Amino acid sequence: MKMSFRWYGKHDPVSLEEIKAIPGMQGIVTAVYDVPVGQAWPLENILELKRTVEAAGLEISVIESIPVHEDIKQGKPNRDELIENYKTSISNVGKAGIPVVCYNFMPVFDWTRSDLNYPLPDGSTSLAFLKADLADVDPVADDLNLPGWDSSYSKEEMKAIIEHYRHHISEEDLWANLDYFIKAIMPTAEAAGVKMAIHPDDPPYGIFGLPRIITGQKAVERFLDLYDSPNNGITMCVGSYASDPQNDVIAMTEYALKRQRINFMHTRNVTAGDWGFQETAHLSQAGDIDMNAIIKLLVDYDWQGPLRPDHGRRIWGDQTKTPGYGLYDRALGATYFNGLYEANMRAAGKTPDFGITVKTVGDK
């Protein structure tokens, strides 16, 4: 397991130097943020990003993400051109020696929350999705701008995209378009040595009348069967899947591990119900997920991929520029998961490697 941390590039208020100081931190999860969606990522842009990260004593473990253009998701006539650009980006990521790309196939937005500062009993705040708060909201009729929406579209363009999904794209249509996309990009990913890792819908159920397809175990089974290759894998985001109480994330994790198709792990805890869900501290008792059981499975199956602590609470006056992505609680999460990993590794008679170089006072 390689502990990793999301970094939003040079404009992220959390610095690489701060991330490097987290015990056992090895990898950075980041992206090229200055290339418009649909265009190919130039190799030099990726290499420049890599040099920046490596100068801080870290390495890029995952690209998260190369966004998929809405015209690909909707199966528009120009999708082949856009897919060729996507394949070029994958090839260039491989040339840069970066092993994993996380992406999603969610219509319109990457994630949705109704509240960015919902209070927890311990006095901290976190991200929450309260169904009642959005029950009467229509993103087309209302002047709405929710977090996770793609800011590269104007409001008028966004409304047109949403209406097209509602009236012309069913869940089966979206599956067909995903199948087309996967079969087109996977030979390139295999040749480039890049493992693709699809992220689940967040939340993993229908909202605003839009189709949602990567939502639970049956969806994961269907997705992995689209293209049988280790390069066609998933991001096992336990917090996203557990946002639907019907999902058994421990069983789902073991299923995907048995198939050797977890290419990236996101670990955050949530408490969920018919009312929606709220993100919590990472500790097992704080939410619905037995985090020790998750990490034990990774050890049992000798999983060697990148893992990052997902969204954190806002604590100790942490920054608010990137909701859920402050330094402090994610750092606590990283040390917590490394602790679970070490305990389970030693219980299995194995020695964990956190990539730490130990120096004494006399070392130069």
Curated annotation (Swiss-Prot):
Q: Which cofactor does it need?
A: Fe(2+); Mn(2+)
Q: Which reaction does it catalyse?
A: D-mannonate = 2-dehydro-3-deoxy-D-gluconate + H2O
Example GO biological process term? D-glucuronate catabolic process
Q: What pathway is this protein said to act in by its record?
A: Carbohydrate metabolism; pentose and glucuronate interconversion
Taxonomically, which superkingdom? Bacteria
Q: Tell me which stretches of the chain form a coiled coil.
A: none
| Residue ranges crossing the lipid bilayer per the database entry | none
Task: List UniProt keywords, sorted A-Z.
Answer: Iron, Lyase, Manganese
Does the record bear tRNA-binding in its keywords? no
Protein EC: 4.2.1.8
UniProt GO MF annotations:
ferrous iron binding; manganese ion binding; mannonate dehydratase activity
Functional note: Catalyzes the dehydration of D-mannonate.
Question: What family name appears in the similarity comment?
Answer: Belongs to the mannonate dehydratase family.
State the name under which the record lists this protein.
Answer: Mannonate dehydratase
Organism (species): Streptococcus equi subsp. zooepidemicus (strain MGCS10565)
